[in-house]
Amino acid sequence: GFPVVVDVDLGENQVPGALESVTDHSMTVKKSLELRNIKIKVTEIAIPVAFASAFEGEVIRRGDMQVEFSSHKAPTCELVETVSADEIEDHKITIVGKDLDELEQGQTFALATYIKVAGAKMQSDFEPVIERKIHAWYNYMEGVMHTGQRNQIRVRVSKDAYEKGLRLKDFAEVLYVMIMDEFDIVVDKCEIEIVTDTEKVQEILETKAMPAYAARDERLETLTDESVDKFYTCTLCQSFAPSHCCVVTPERLGLCGAVSWLDAKATKELNPEGPCQPISKE
């Protein structure tokens, strides 16, 4: 049958998934959609610059940049973390620290892209797959250049994009829309935090990002080339190296150093026609 949502507090008389209370009327529609597992897809991203794969590979020279975020001079990281649905608020965007219009032009700063996701079908193996896509999605924005992965990244924003009104909330909006579009099979809710405060970035890096990276690497160490029956191709970097293709095995990462065999396997599961395809060892 159909779930029922009422605006009176039923307390312990609620039946999860069938009869639930929502006393805040502003949350009634959201709860109703959630109970019926109905997801709304955004067809146009409301940002002040163009957004398309045609901009992937755009190079922004130092003389043309408004600001830069780089691990060479400041702490940086990108992390996707799976949490329970009641721990996050869908489409919540938080900017911690100074925005682009408050940062000194031409200088380098810290940056953390911290994404929390929740979903009944979400697995920890899918986290690095979503992280890898941050590279492409940032590059899809006109006037934005992104290179690297994990805690070794560089992001440049052009003066032209800044003057058009591009701000960090637009970065977060792009991430939210693309995650809910490309990973809607496994992600039901998504919350995004963009951090430029150096101390906060360092805290996220040390307490959350590095332990997560280490746990993934440790799991991979138990696998060998002989213990699996297939390898995977990876063409994620073709935005910058159009003719390049890596062969990823348990003992050999992609040349970028960020795509492991488990990442490639999860990418294939999430996107069967995507950049990672199996290669039989036979």
Locate predicted features:
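Cysteine-centered metal-binding/redox modules
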Residues: 1-282
